């Protein structure tokens, strides 16, 4: 009888131990936020007509037009912006006449921020001045200003340039 009672005791203790070993659970909600990539925009507004001087050139610092860049991330700096064109002249954009005579003039691209510092983006890989300024929130105007004829006299007519912008670190 002693042998049977010890077997029964072991069976009862095993059942008690199993009953007290409950499974514990915890839960949480995992989330992830997805944002759309920056979608930059570039628009151009032509300035007032420019008068050709008697020598066939144009004055410097005349407003040719305004490039407005938008859609970049807050905190983007001026040297993160690179305007390019087919001529590829470092620091300058080249406008070409549409009369078929290939008259050209060059421009620089600058801006002003609220602190009245020059904002100098890269143009064809190089910037005109060394200031690296945080761009305005939302959009930034860049002023396209004349430098002068690119060899030879200019003729009256429409001048154009196909400008592409790349903004780094977006």
Swiss-Prot record:
Region (Contains potential antigenic determinants that may stimulate T-cells) location: 100-150
InterPro entries in alphabetical order: Adhesion_dom_fimbrial_sf (IPR036937), Adhesion_dom_sf (IPR008966), Caf1 (IPR015335)
Position of the signal peptide: 1-21
Entry's localization field: Secreted, Capsule
Pfam families: Antig_Caf1
Keywords tagged on the record: Capsule, Plasmid, Secreted, Signal
Biological process, per Gene Ontology: cell adhesion
GO CC, alphabetical: capsule; extracellular region; pilus
Protein name: F1 capsule antigen
Taxonomic source organism: Yersinia pestis
């Amino acid at each position: 009888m002693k042998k049977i009672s010890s077997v029964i005791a072991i069976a009862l203790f095993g059942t008690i131990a199993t009953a007290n070993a409950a499974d514990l659970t915890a839960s949480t909600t995992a989330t992830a936020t997805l944002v759309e990539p920056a979608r930059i925009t570039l628009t151009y507004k032509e300035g007032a007509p420019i008068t050709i001087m008697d020598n066939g050139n144009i004055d410097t610092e005349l407003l040719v037009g305004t490039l407005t860049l938008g859609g970049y991330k807050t905190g983007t700096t001026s040297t993160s912006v690179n305007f390019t064109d087919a001529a590829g002249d470092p620091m300058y954009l080249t406008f070409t006449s549409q009369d078929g005579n290939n008259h050209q003039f060059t421009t620089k691209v600058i801006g002003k921020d609220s602190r009245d510092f020059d904002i100098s983006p890269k143009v064809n890989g190089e910037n005109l001045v060394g200031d690296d300024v945080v761009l305005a929130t939302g959009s930034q105007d860049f002023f396209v200003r004349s430098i002068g004829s690119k060899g030879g006299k200019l003729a009256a007519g429409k001048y154009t340039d196909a400008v592409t912008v790349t903004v780094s670190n977006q």
